[in-house]
């Protein structure tokens, strides 16, 4: 006997998949979902189980049959006959059951249904459905598949609602990892905060001041050397801080689909003001769509000028509350610890307004903050639990790796057994090192976690061979037509600030079919790797005016499939974007040399011109190819073939090591020893 799936067995025995799964659990048989395969032993057990329940159903049919047969004056000895008699009685009982079943209010299906299956779901005879389809101009048999529209049309005719079931594979748990829990299960959770800003403006010193420890002094050159996550308690409430090495790591995680941050603290030095990296940090935070709190640091310096900082930040739509805006500005001195309490209170205030919640009573889900391979402990991963509760011993899938949580260590180095929402923990027990930004999910069963992890690793390998789908000017028009694009994200880099402003202003005016241009970042100087990472995370196109991408930017753009457009004239940029939006971008061609022939002899013919007797030395010569005449290594003419012959016959092509006769359009000065090079123009796949 071949294996059968849960839903197939349920359908065969006219019971719901849910009831069958409940029955299997009562029989201590583990099934994960309705797609689980049942082996012969389990099927036999189920057959025995449902056969013992049949008499009660038969009794019901017996009562119904007696009523029907009394009306028709036919009766008795119902169960005495065997073989065909039993089958006839079963069929009769089945017909009576069909007659007494009420029409459902709603039916569900997945993918498609055959005419017979639809008839069963609607409690109608297949012939009735076939008749309705015929009236609609559809010739169908009982086993013919019907699409969604046809199913809805027939069901609506009976006044029955239709719902399509979307089956999501557990290997793609990212698709349902962020599903909303019921409101009554949600509990308040700590906010997750990222500190960003220009180099040397005091990001690590601020975090150090918050944690009351001297981290900065121990780090080389005052630069954060790894991504850490720490939790602090303020007024009996917790706040989780992510310590990132600049905004690039923050955006790399977002590019991998991980939205970990709730609030961004933008650190700006009161004596320095807004710097290039400050602007980048603002754009990264805005692209992530998270609230920004501005911490005006170094207020202890004599040159501190907080008003100038406020004035400069208004240009980037960060208007302080004191000036009628909605951005919170907090003056602080991280090195002296002044204003820190006020900053923490503001974080709690934003948390209260935003109402960050999670469900602690479920299996944990979240994101990898950092991961590394330790010689003694094996794979170590810092995880941020975003929903549910992670426990020691939980089977877990992290990106394409899997394992069981062997040990958990908190941010202060203590071993813990459980970690709730917004809690950062360091775990061991994974089979390989995951990447920062990978999502994780805990499961009930280690076997299932292993299967899902292995499947995801295989899928990732296959996906690597394919190309990532990123927005490019070539497919822009198609995506606009399909309604996939409502706004085009652009990153603009130029050689001088004036060019940046002029180009950004011109681009913002473009509006084609209601699709507008959004400039998510501008800057002066070469296109950097940071620009490419932001473009990848935001699905943006990079425009360079009089600037080039550096080596790292080129490499990253190739890996991430980010479209870079380089120009030297502003109106050409505008024209290209508009043309792409209207689907009129000119195709790009490249030349491909397909063959060469050597002129061995020439013949002059009246009214024809010079005929070259040639020998094909390489590749092939085709009738529709372009040709160039090369004499002594110099190209002396470029044009088209007029005729191509083998003996007296016109031919479409002549292959290598064959002789042929050639005439060239509007050119007769052919000489022995000339090389005729044939080429074609091929459209470049962008």
Swiss-Prot record:
Biological process per Gene Ontology, one example term: translational initiation
List every stretch annotated G4: 297-300
Q: Name the Gene3D superfamilies for this protein.
A: 1.10.10.2480, P-loop containing nucleotide triphosphate hydrolases, Translation factors, Translation initiation factor IF- 2, domain 3
- Biased segments, Basic residues type: 69-81
Primary localisation category: cytoplasm
Source species of the chain: Bacillus cereus (strain ATCC 14579 / DSM 31 / CCUG 7414 / JCM 2152 / NBRC 15305 / NCIMB 9373 / NCTC 2599 / NRRL B-3711)
Any idea what this protein is called?
A: Translation initiation factor IF-2
User: Any idea which UniProt keywords this protein has?
Assistant: Cytoplasm, GTP-binding, Initiation factor, Nucleotide-binding, Protein biosynthesis
Residue intervals of the tr-type G domain: 188-357
Query: Residues annotated as region G1?
Result: 197-204
One GO MF term: translation initiation factor activity
What is the annotated role of this protein in its UniProt record? One of the essential components for the initiation of protein synthesis. Protects formylmethionyl-tRNA from spontaneous hydrolysis and promotes its binding to the 30S ribosomal subunits. Also involved in the hydrolysis of GTP during the formation of the 70S ribosomal complex.
Q: Where in the cell is it found?
A: Cytoplasm
Q: Which PROSITE patterns match?
A: G_TR_2 (PS51722), IF2 (PS01176)
What the entry lists under NCBIfam families is as follows: IF-2, small_GTP
> Its domain of life?
Bacteria
* Entry's family note: Belongs to the TRAFAC class translation factor GTPase superfamily. Classic translation factor GTPase family. IF-2 subfamily.
Under the cellular component aspect of Gene Ontology, which terms does the record hold? cytoplasm; cytosol
